Amino acid sequence: MSRIGKVPIPIPDKVNVTIKGQAVTVKGPKGELSREITPEVAIEQADNLVTVTRRNESRIARQRHGLSRTLIANMVEGVSKGFEKKLQIQGVGYRAQVQGRNLILNVGYSNPVTIEPPEGVQVAVESNTNVIVSGINKEVVGNTAARIRAVRPPEPYKGKGIRYADEYVRRKVGKAGKK
């Protein structure tokens, strides 16, 4: 039995979960999310709990049991609390700004880089060097943050670039000068 899959998902008061076949729809104060869950697992709702069980003991069913439970739990958390990723920009003259919905990054290239966030994702900038990506879908928020980081990943010699707020960048010593 999957350790993650067997844990029931508690549903907060203001969240409504609808299950139609393999389609799960979660509505909450922050919005609505829908997802098709793999047919190898069965989803049941009783009182304020959603449980995910395997239909059989096949390898695929065992693999997707915990995944399906986590996807539904992330949907419930997203519509009730939301998700956010924080990024830091480090480097002389490196900065970010929001123009309309778009994020404009000045990170050492000859032209500024413009990133348009997908629907349902908000981008905010604090003090020109801190970017906050937020939304209700954990997967889309994470992908958007990764796209922003990929514009200028942190380099190991000076530490310049865009990094996650909780990321540790391993520093390297440069080559020794001539003697």
UniProtKB/Swiss-Prot annotation:
Keyword rRNA-binding: yes
The entry's keywords: Ribonucleoprotein, Ribosomal protein, RNA-binding, rRNA-binding
Classification via Pfam families: Ribosomal_L6 (PF00347)
Keyword flag RNA-binding: yes
SUPFAM superfamilies: Ribosomal protein L6
Family matches, as PROSITE patterns: RIBOSOMAL_L6_1 (PS00525)
GO cellular component, one term: cytosolic large ribosomal subunit
Cleavable signal peptide: none
InterPro entries assigned to the protein according to its UniProt record, in alphabetical order: Ribosomal_uL6-like, Ribosomal_uL6-like_a/b-dom_sf, Ribosomal_uL6_a/b-dom, Ribosomal_uL6_bac-type, Ribosomal_uL6_CS
GO molecular function ontology, one term from the record: rRNA binding
Protein family according to the UniProt entry: Belongs to the universal ribosomal protein uL6 family.
Complex formation: Part of the 50S ribosomal subunit.
Role played: This protein binds to the 23S rRNA, and is important in its secondary structure. It is located near the subunit interface in the base of the L7/L12 stalk, and near the tRNA binding site of the peptidyltransferase center.
Descriptive protein name: Large ribosomal subunit protein uL6
